[in-house]
Amino acid sequence: MLLKSLEFKRGDGIQVKVTEIPVLKEDEHYFFMLHHHLQFYLKEVFSSNSRAKVYSFRHYMKRRMKWADYQAVFHQEVLKHNA
């Protein structure tokens, strides 16, 4: 799975980074739901008064999605023998 991150400055001048954002094609099943949640999460981070500089979208989605959907989106293959 391909993940991306975003960096921006909030209104109070603090530079924040949002990590672990999955990259999905527009025709994939979970694209709309993740896009919608990402917009809400970025609004929440932008208007936050927290002093945190790094936020994880994966941890946010772990709290918001059903577990089966979360595993379908963020599932990572386990490699045998560290190959």
Curated annotation (Swiss-Prot):
Official protein name in the record: Uncharacterized protein YpmP
